[in-house]
Amino acid sequence: QHSTDYDEVEDDRAKLHLDAR
């Protein structure tokens, strides 16, 4: 499992994207 800030940011963005929808 990769635990990097970039991965976390990407996940956050994906969640925001779904929320924005």
From Swiss-Prot:
Biological process according to GO: adaptive immune response; blood coagulation; innate immune response
Ranges of biased composition (kind: Basic and acidic residues): 12-21
Disulfide bonds: none
Post-translational changes noted in the entry: Conversion of fibrinogen to fibrin is triggered by thrombin, which cleaves fibrinopeptides A and B from alpha and beta chains, and thus exposes the N-terminal polymerization sites responsible for the formation of the soft clot.
Region listing for Disordered, in residue ranges: 1-21
Location(s), subcellular: Secreted
Predominant cellular place of this UniProt entry's protein: secreted
Glycosylation sites: 4
Superkingdom in the source lineage: Eukaryota
Stretches with biased composition (Acidic residues): 1-11
Keywords for this protein: Adaptive immunity, Blood coagulation, Coiled coil, Disulfide bond, Glycoprotein, Hemostasis, Immunity, Innate immunity, Pyrrolidone carboxylic acid, Secreted, Sulfation
GO cellular component labels: extracellular region
Presence of the UniProt keyword Lipid metabolism in the record: no
Residues bearing PTM Pyrrolidone carboxylic acid: 1
Sites of Sulfotyrosine modification: 6
Assembly: Heterohexamer; disulfide linked. Contains 2 sets of 3 non-identical chains (alpha, beta and gamma). The 2 heterotrimers are in head to head conformation with the N-termini in a small central domain.
Main function: Cleaved by the protease thrombin to yield monomers which, together with fibrinogen alpha (FGA) and fibrinogen gamma (FGG), polymerize to form an insoluble fibrin matrix. Fibrin has a major function in hemostasis as one of the primary components of blood clots. In addition, functions during the early stages of wound repair to stabilize the lesion and guide cell migration during re-epithelialization. Was originally thought to be essential for platelet aggregation, based on in vitro studies using anticoagulated blood.
Domains (record comment): A long coiled coil structure formed by 3 polypeptide chains connects the central nodule to the C-terminal domains (distal nodules). The long C-terminal ends of the alpha chains fold back, contributing a fourth strand to the coiled coil structure.
Protein name: Fibrinogen beta chain
Species: Muntiacus muntjak
Lineage: Eukaryota, Metazoa, Chordata, Craniata, Vertebrata
